[in-house]
Swiss-Prot record:
Belongs to the acetyltransferase family. It is an enzyme of class 2 (transferase). Its EC number is 2.3.1.-. This is Uncharacterized N-acetyltransferase YitI.
Length: 149
């Protein structure tokens, strides 16, 4: 059974490093936004084991017109659990939480090879693809949220 919980930023580092940035040090897996006011980190647990993580921070995106936006960063799921729907469960949980607090949009710099994953969750591409040196091709993706306010 999957369970989404708020976790500490420190709980994200091992999976960030292992899945997203194995060629970098743990220190390079720490983002400046991790401790920003309003930031939060979610984890999905399967039978008590942390299998998927993501971080969210208040951050505008110049290409978005929505006044209130959060950035998704460091989304990763352990290889052996990718068919469990942990990532989509986490994203849906975060979207609901953000919408309930009045956030109008959520966005990320998606790696090019996973843009279809986000599209299946209702996210849209924005702007042109770009390269992050040492990491690869990305595209900005976003979703407008239905706020309750």
């Amino acid at each position: 059974m999957l369970e989404v919980k708020t976790i500490s930023v420190e709980d994200t580092y091992e999976i960030r490093h292992r899945i997203l940035r194995p060629h970098q040090s743990i220190e390079q897996c720490k983002y400046k936004e991790d401790h920003a006011e309003g930031s939060f980190h979610l984890g999905v647990f399967y039978d008590g084991t942390l299998i998927s993580i993501a971080s969210f921070s208040p951050q505008s995106q110049p290409l978005l017109t929505e006044a209130s936006a959060y950035r998704l960063r460091g989304m990763a799921t352990l290889e052996g659990y990718r068919d469990q729907k942990a990532g989509s469960t986490l994203i849906k949980h975060a979207e609901h939480k953000l919408a309930e607090s009045g956030v109008q949009a959520v966005w990320c710099n998606a790696r090019h090879h996973v843009k279809g994953y986000y599209a299946k969750l209702g996210w849209k591409e924005l702007g042109e693809p770009f390269d992050i040196p040492g990491i690869g091709n990305h595209i900005v993706m976003y979703k407008t949220l239905r706020t309750s306010r």
